[in-house]
Amino acid sequence: MNIEILGKSFPMSMGLDAVKEITAKMGCTMEQMGDVMTAGTPEEQLANITVMAAAMARSAYRREKVRCVLWGEDCKLVEPPDADQMLCAFDLLDSKKLIEAVTETMQEANKTTVDVEPSKNAKSHA
């Protein structure tokens, strides 16, 4: 998932570093992160979601830096804005995009896939 900030697109990732940062800043567990998005006043909710978005954008940035080092690539990366900068960059009309980006990034992290190989799966004899 990407988030657009003032015309620039930044990838978002729910890496373990993002989980660690979000739970530490929000004082919640991994299971409670969804609840944090809906807790408090609308202003507090937007601030919390912005903190989460910034952590997810930083996670994707750090992941790409590691990938570049591992593959010996010279990557020209732009560091994403922090939460305070995001609050300045977004207005109320953008808040829906922000909420969707955070929600979709969390949902993508929870997706699991199952490979089905008919030759290796048990047959039902019901």
Question: Which role fits each region the language model picked out?
Answer:
Residues 22-27:
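Short amphipathic alpha-helical "interface-anchor" segments enriched in bulky aromatics
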Residues 10-12:
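Short, isolated positions in well-ordered beta-strands
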Residues 48-59, 104:
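Short, hydrophobic/amphipathic alpha-helical patches that form generic packing surfaces
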Residues 1-4, 28-44, 61-126:
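Charged interaction scaffolds used for protein-protein
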